[in-house]
Amino acid sequence: MIPAASSTPPGDALFPSVAPQDFWRSQVTGYSGSVTRHLSHRANNFKRHPKRRKCIRPSPPPPPNTPCPLELVDFGDLHPQRSFRELLFNGCILFGIEFSYAMETAYVTPVLLQMGLPDQLYSLVWFISPILGFLLQPLLGAWSDRCTSRFGRRRPFILVLAIGALLGLSLLLNGRDIGIALADVTGNHKWGLLLTVCGVVLMDFSADSADNPSHAYMMDVCSPADQDRGLNIHALLAGLGGGFGYVVGGIHWDKTGFGRALGGQLRVIYLFTAVTLSVTTVLTLVSIPERPLRPPSEKRAAMKSPSLPLPPSPPVLPEEGPGDSLPSHTATNFSSPISPPSPLTPKYGSFISRDSSLTGISEFASSFGTANIDSVLIDCFTGGHDSYLAIPGSVPRPPISVSFPRAPDGFYRQDRGLLEGREGALTSGCDGDILRVGSLDTSKPRSSGILKRPQTLAIPDAAGGGGPETSRRRNVTFSQQVANILLNGVKYESELTGSSERAEQPLSVGRLCSTICNMPKALRTLCVNHFLGWLSFEGMLLFYTDFMGEVVFQGDPKAPHTSEAYQKYNSGVTMGCWGMCIYAFSAAFYSAILEKLEEFLSVRTLYFIAYLAFGLGTGLATLSRNLYVVLSLCITYGILFSTLCTLPYSLLCDYYQSKKFAGSSADGTRRGMGVDISLLSCQYFLAQILVSLVLGPLTSAVGSANGVMYFSSLVSFLGCLYSSLFVIYEIPPSDAADEEHRPLLLNV
């Protein structure tokens, strides 16, 4: 017979005596003392190192397993661990984009100069695309955040931008031939110049904009544990794509039978680039299924419906009396005749922290995807006006009750509108036929605990033989916020209190500008640092082949085509492609080892090394005319490129673990990952705008392409200082220091 709830002393209700828990003792020694060991979203203080996962508190015993049809449970928001193949295919679009971009950067300047574009104007070709990107990139990011296409939020944008890049590439590499077919004559390529410039703008904008939905796509479908791997694979594939692109561009196809058959160097390059971009785009689109975004008006049944199926709680036996007999399923071996053991049993209470994210909870919840789903009831404070839940008395059932160890009175404190939790109780009638789960204080009109009002979760018992045992429905009390933890990972309080049900504000330019102007300080400093990095890198990248042709090989792009100076310039452009190939492969190699380096070096140190190496590499290239020295310095360019493609987005993911940074839907400060990724990418466009405005006149003033390398070296050293002194690598704990002293479920 289970004693009534009123007869249980408060101390025993919170911490059950050891005698009834003899079956637990061997596996959870000292569990009651672990209630003060908790996990908040700041438990790791946003430190990325060390990356080893640590157990926050010991595990109580696993409960019995209860069969549950998987189709009844919505696990759509859970992200299982992705395989290397999935992450590789997901990042293939970066390979194709960088392959195409390598062709663009290698051949745009030489092609335009050879068609007669003046020196003062050729840098302005890069001016239009970044302006479009700067104006449209945040809008595209915000639009993708709210896209409700059945193909997902990111994949439609990836497809459209890839098509735009392919069309721009067609105009860029075939503009001269199309112009001649229209009206151009030798010495006057006005149509060819117009088509080539349009192709550069379309190709550059589409290629740069495709990076953002591809990064957001990976972050949407991957757990936090896979996001670092995904970013590194993205940078690796981007480096490999650029490397192979420069290899193709560095071959003299005019001297091969294949090149002569296709009609020249540019035709071969176009064929390789079009095929590569098309194949990689298809691989990315089919890599990982993307779940469509529900319209704002559609309610989320998995979170709000009281019929959400979840398994029942584990039984814990009362004190055995002299005349009592044990029921058929006991807590000794934690299994039952109707519930065979699961091959993968989650350990309740052993939540794991990594990089301040609740990765362990996602892994814990993802373990439900087995043949036999483990049952769970996290019995904690509800303190609300809850109706009693009853199992029909006609169904035979052993008189059992369950409760996990609870925190003492006053352990949970009132904060930010959440009232102090009150103790819940499990009561049973005298006949033992009814199992009631409710609150001691039932007079309150609304929930006042740390968790919101529990939902009634009905589960059909699908296992077992015939008779009433097979048709009974088990009613389980499960808090909505706990369900959010298990099924959705990290959810902030504003989303769990019902504010997420409100219709989101419509997207507008004014609201977007407000988001940009009111960006957090951490994001602002990261954007400035990102801008300096791209400013130095783009100055080198866009004009490196011209630097090799004019400075290193002493050629002249405007000389007669039969002259030696013109041939030297072409040889320099080809050798510049091989230099860019070295840079791209060094970027791929550095991306492969960057994750290992993060275990030994801080992000600040890695930033410092990247900027310093690039500044030295570009500066020393202007002091030497030795071809091998200049080519070997290209290794330093890959270090900065890999850093710019990885570390800013990794820091942004860390920032989003801060509740203050992410904002709240209730007060309209909620931020979107797509918008913030676009804000980071806008720094690339700003850098390209400044490069296009400054480097043309600077090159004319200096008299050679050496001015480009001087500029890049100087800006890189400025970025080195800024990344060391101003960038915020850890969100200060003062914004929510008290959260370190609260249990796990309070602020999840």
From Swiss-Prot:
Highest taxon of the lineage: Eukaryota
InterPro entries documented for this protein: MFS (IPR011701), MFS_trans_sf (IPR036259)
GO cellular component: membrane
MF-aspect GO terms: D-glucose:proton symporter activity; galactose:proton symporter activity; sucrose:proton symporter activity
Reaction(s) the record says it catalyses: D-galactose(in) + H(+)(in) = D-galactose(out) + H(+)(out); D-glucose(out) + H(+)(out) = D-glucose(in) + H(+)(in)
UniProt-annotated stretches for the region Disordered: 294-339
Keywords, ordered alphabetically: Disease variant, Epilepsy, Intellectual disability, Membrane, Phosphoprotein, Sugar transport, Symport, Transmembrane, Transmembrane helix, Transport
ATP-binding listed as a keyword: no
SUPFAM superfamilies: MFS general substrate transporter (SSF103473)
The protein's role, per its UniProt record: Proton-associated glucose transporter in the brain.
UniProt-recorded name of the protein: Proton-associated sugar transporter A
